Regions:
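Structured beta-strand-rich core segments of catalytic domains in phosphoester-bond hydrolases
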Residues: 1-62
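Short intrinsically disordered coil segments
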Residues: 3-14, 73-75, 187-194
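Metal-dependent phosphoester-hydrolase catalytic domains
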Residues: 28, 44, 83-95, 101-204
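Intrinsic disorder
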Residues: 30, 50, 65-72, 165
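Internal, well-ordered alpha-helical segments in soluble enzyme and binding-protein domains
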Residues: 39-41, 74, 78, 108
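Short, conserved beta-strand edge motifs with alternating hydrophobic and charged residues
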Residues: 57-59, 95-98
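Solvent-exposed loop/turn segments at secondary-structure junctions
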Residues: 61-64, 100-103
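A long, amphipathic alpha-helix that forms part
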Residues: 66-91
């Protein structure tokens, strides 16, 4: 006995569209990393009273959390660039700050703060076959807030898009090389203490 099924016209249209969808090659993390045009800003500053100089950079990382290897490459390059420019200016005092779009549990953060990342980690960028690439920056860096408080802030980003659940986590950091002593940081609120948002307000 032959069974007959009635196929909904919408289902037929969906199947046709799916079959007609263009096939894209697998994404290459290195090409993705090179294709971003985020800019880093560097300056050498000198303390007027002591004459001590610092190399200071700020960077806004790509928001590519679905491509963790791309995030690691940009994090490592930002740290390496900052340290190398500082050294050119005759100082080993480097400061790197900005919106990194990585969380404290991410491999990019681990690489910056330990100068080490397991090659099997999903965040570790694998070089092309037959090539070599040292992803580790010249030295590890210290997160100022964790250095002083023993942990990162509860959050630096509190965002809500339409009907999605709010995203609350730490994405912004101030990193310094180990030779810089961090004495204090500005206090930041816990998410439970924030009742007067969103920021900026109409008056800011």
């Amino acid at each position: 006995m032959v069974k007959r099924y009635v196929v909904d016209p919408i289902v037929r249209m969906w199947r046709a569209a799916r079959n007609a969808r263009p096939q894209y090659p697998p994404q290459d993390d290195w090409e993705l990393a090179k294709g971003r045009f985020n800019s880093i800003v560097y300056a050498n500053v000198t303390h007027k009273q002591t004459g001590v100089s610092f190399g200071v950079s700020t960077y806004h990382m790509p928001c590519m959390f679905r491509n963790p290897k791309v995030m690691t490459l940009h994090s490592a390059l930002a740290a390496t660039y900052t340290m190398r420019e500082s050294e050119k200016d005759g100082t080993k005092n480097s400061i790197l700050m900005g919106d990194f779009n990585v969380k404290p549990i991410d491999g990019s953060y681990e690489l910056l703060t330990t100068n080490n990342l397991d090659e099997n980690d999903v965040f570790y960028p694998i070089p092309y076959e037959g090539t070599e690439y040292i992803v580790e920056p010249p030295a590890r860096m210290v997160s100022c807030y964790k250095e002083v408080n023993g942990e990162e802030p509860d959050f630096t980003n509190y965002a809500k898009i339409k009907d999605d659940e709010p995203f609350i986590d730490t994405l912004d950091y101030i990193f310094v090389t180990e030779n810089i002593r961090v004495d204090a940081v500005a206090p930041l609120k816990h998410r439970d203490e924030v009742t007067d948002g969103p920021y900026p307000s109409e008056n800011e």
